[in-house]
C-alpha cells in the first residue's frame, strides 16, 4: 500500500481494518497505517533496485555513450527527468524554471533530458512550452520511445543529476535507480522521496523542503496535502548541482549507491516478501481456511 501524505486519512480506517496484513512501500505510508489503524498488522517494505542493471559504468563507457546519444554535451551539465507527463509531476514548471536557470549560467552550459510523453493527455504540451520559451535548440531534449532498462541505466550514468519535483510522490523509482547508478538527485521532500535523499546522516543530492502545502481532495479522498516548491528553491538547487565539481557530484552519487545497496537491494526484497507471504499464510490461512473471514452471513427474511 502507498499513501502519499498527511493529514492522516481517517476515512481509510475501514479499508485498512478489512485487511489481515498491510505492506507499506514507504516510511510515510507505514506511519499513516500505524496511526490510522493501529490494531491492524502492518510492515514496511520499500521498492528495490536490480543492481545487475542499474549500476555505475566506467567513465570511458559513459563518455562514448554521451557522445553518441547526446552530442555536443561534453562540457555541459546534464540534468535528467524520468517521469510521466502528468500534472502532479510538475513537468511544465520544471521547464520554465530550467529556462531561468539557463538565463543565469548560459544556454550552452547545461541540458535537460526529459524521458516522457510530450503530449500526454494528463499533462502539458511540452513541445509548445519549449517553443514559447525559446529553448528548442537542444537545451531541452525529449526521449519518448520505450527503452530497455540497460539503456535507461546508461542515461542515469550519463546524467550529472536526476530531478523529481513532484508535488505528490508515493515513492519515486527513477531517483532510486539514479542513485543506484551513482548519480545524485534533486527531490522535493515529500512522500517516499524523503527516505531516498538522506539516511539521516548523509545527503545524496539536494532535498527541498516544500515551500507551501495545499489541502486538495475529491469526493473519495476528502483531504491530502499537496507539497509545492517555488521557482526560487528549484533554480537554487539546479545552481548548487551545477556549481559542484564533477568529483563532488560523484561523491554524493557514490554515497547514494551505498544507501541503495544497503536499504533497497533485490536480495533483501525477495527474502522479505517470501517471509511476509509465509508468515501471513501461517497466521491467517488461505482461501480454504482463512481466519477472520466468513463467506456467509445470517439475515432475517420477512
Task: Set out the residue ranges of the language-model regions.
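C-terminal amphipathic helix plus adjacent low-complexity
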Residues: 215-227, 231-302
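Glycosyltransferase donor-sugar binding loop
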Residues: 109-126, 145
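Conserved donor-binding/catalytic core segment of Leloir-type glycosyltransferases
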Residues: 72-89, 95-98, 112-113
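Nucleotide-activated donor-binding/catalytic signature segment of Leloir-type glycosyltransferases, i.e.
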Residues: 123-150, 154
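Aromatic "clamp/platform" in nucleotide-sugar-dependent glycosyltransferases that forms part
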Residues: 167
Amino acid at each position: 500500500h502507498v499513501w502519499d501524505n498527511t493529514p492522516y486519512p481517517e476515512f481509510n480506517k475501514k479499508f485498512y481494518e478489512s485487511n489481515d496484513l498491510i505492506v507499506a512501500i514507504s516510511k510515510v505510508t507505514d506511519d499513516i497505517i500505524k496511526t490510522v489503524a493501529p490494531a491492524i498488522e502492518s510492515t514496511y517494505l520499500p521498492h528495490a533496485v536490480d543492481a545487475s542493471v542499474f549500476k555505475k559504468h566506467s567513465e570511458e563507457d559513459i563518455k562514448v555513450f554521451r557522445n553518441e546519444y547526446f552530442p555536443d554535451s561534453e562540457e555541459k551539465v546534464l540534468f535528467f527527468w524520468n517521469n510521466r507527463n502528468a500534472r502532479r509531476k510538475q513537468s511544465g514548471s520544471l521547464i520554465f524554471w530550467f529556462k531561468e536557470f539557463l538565463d543565469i549560467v548560459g544556454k550552452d552550459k547545461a541540458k535537460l533530458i526529459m524521458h516522457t510523453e510530450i503530449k500526454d493527455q494528463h499533462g502539458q504540451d511540452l513541445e509548445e512550452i519549449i517553443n514559447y520559451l525559446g529553448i528548442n535548440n537542444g537545451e531541452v531534449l525529449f526521449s519518448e520511445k520505450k527503452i530497455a532498462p540497460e539503456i535507461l541505466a546508461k542515461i542515469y550514468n550519463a546524467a550529472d543529476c536526476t530531478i523529481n519535483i513532484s508535488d505528490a510522490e508515493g515513492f519515486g523509482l527513477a531517483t532510486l535507480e539514479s542513485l543506484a547508478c551513482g548519480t545524485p538527485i534533486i527531490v522535493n521532500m515529500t512522500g517516499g522521496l524523503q527516505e531516498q535523499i538522506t539516511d539521516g546522516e548523509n545527503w545524496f543530492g539536494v532535498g527541498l523542503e516544500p515551500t507551501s502545502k495545499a489541502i486538495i481532495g475529491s469526493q473519495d479522498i476528502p483531504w491530502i496535502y499537496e507539497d509545492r516548491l517555488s521557482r526560487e528553491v528549484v533554480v537554487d538547487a539546479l545552481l548548487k548541482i551545477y556549481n559542484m565539481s564533477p568529483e563532488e557530484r560523484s561523491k554524493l552519487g557514490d554515497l547514494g549507491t551505498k544507501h541503495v545497496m544497503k536499504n533497497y537491494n533485490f536480495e533483501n526484497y525477495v527474502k522479505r516478501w517470501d517471509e511476509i507471504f509465509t508468515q501471513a499464510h501461517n497466521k491467517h490461512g488461505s482461501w480454504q481456511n482463512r481466519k477472520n473471514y466468513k463467506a456467509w452471513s445470517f439475515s432475517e427474511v420477512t
